[in-house]
Structure formats: C-alpha cells, structure tokens
C-alpha cells in the first residue's frame, strides 16, 4: 500500500511520478533482486503503471531484460479539453492552491456498485477490484487531484522526450476502446 500525503485516502495525488519510480526501484532492489538473484527480470505495466514502467526503464536501463506495456499512460486523454485548456486549468488551479482538490468529474470513493458507468469493459475484472476495495480500505483510491494531473503531464512529456533511452525489447499493447489514455502516443 502507498502512503497518503493527504488525509482523504481515496484521493490520488503525488508531487512527481519520480516518487512512484523510487518506490518501484526500492521494491525491485530490496525484494525482487534479493529473492530472484541474477535471473532475468521482465517488467509489466498497465495504464498508469505503464507510465511508471516506462520512466523506470528510461532511468534504470540495466535492471530488466524485456518489458510489456499495456495501454501505457504516455499521454492522457481529457475528453473535449485541448492540451492548452488543460494547461490553463492546471495553472489556475495552482494559483488558487487547488493542488489537492479533486479534478472535475473525480470524486471520493463510495461503495456504490456501478459497472455500467465505469471505465472497465470486463465485469469480472470490475467485480474483482470492487471486492478488493470493499474489503480493504487502503485500496479505495478513486479520484485524481490537480497535483496528480500536473505530475502525470510532466511524466508524459519526460517519457516521450527520453523514449530512446529504453534499450530493451518492449511489447506495446493498446486498448482500442480506451478513452483515458491516448493510443497515438505509444507510436
């Protein structure tokens, strides 16, 4: 489980995606490498985890042999908002000190079962995640903050600028119906 920098445990917020990369590096070096020894390591990352995996591969090119990135969050989609509009909104939110406020349409966790309006296409997967959240309070992360969005945009720019630093084979998988992550950014 991750520590929360805010009292609302359902709020997804981070100063920098480098925090996630540091956590992953500590896990890999302190647990995985000690347990697995010199065996080849393969990295799998999905969505936001795919962005974290890409950052990790760029910053630690010697650790993994191969990787799979599934719908990696190399670039987020913002509905009808242009990138310029998103930057303007994030700037205003920063000036108003809304960093740890929920983004529009983002909300705290509720235990309401609502597969139909979720971003999930698999009911079995939704049911599994729903059960985990009901049973364990620390799984109840739900809504992103302005701070998280800003950190995500910065991470996306870094990933694209430094993609050539990934030297291992990477299988890139995309979800045709994904409306949260841009498929075009993975090319």
Regions picked out by a protein language model, each given a short descriptive name:
Residues 1-14:
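Glycine-rich "HGGG/HGxG" loop immediately N-terminal to the catalytic nucleophile
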Residues 12-33:
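Alpha/beta-hydrolase active-site loop
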Residues 143-162:
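Active-site nucleophile elbow and catalytic-triad environment of alpha/beta-hydrolase enzymes
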């Amino acid at each position: 489980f991750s520590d929360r920098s805010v009292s609302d445990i359902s709020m997804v917020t981070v100063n920098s995606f480098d925090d996630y990369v540091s956590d992953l590096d500590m896990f890999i070096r302190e647990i995985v490498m000690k347990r697995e020894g010199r065996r080849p390591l393969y990295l799998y990352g999905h969505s936001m985890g795919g962005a974290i995996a890409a950052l990790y591969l760029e910053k630690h090119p010697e650790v993994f042999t191969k990787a799979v990135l599934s719908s990696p969050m190399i670039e987020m989609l913002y509905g009808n908002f242009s990138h310029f509009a998103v930057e303007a909104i994030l700037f205003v939110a920063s000036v108003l000190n809304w960093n740890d406020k929920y983004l529009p349409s983002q909300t705290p966790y509720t235990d309401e079962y609502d597969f139909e309006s979720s971003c999930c296409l698999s009911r079995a997967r939704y049911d599994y995640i729903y059960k985990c959240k009901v049973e364990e309070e620390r799984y109840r992360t739900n809504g992103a903050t302005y701070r998280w969005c800003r950190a995500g945009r910065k991470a996306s720019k870094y990933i694209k600028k430094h993609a050539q630093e990934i030297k291992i084979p990477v299988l890139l998988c995309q979800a045709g119906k994904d409306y949260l992550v841009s498929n075009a950014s993975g090319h």
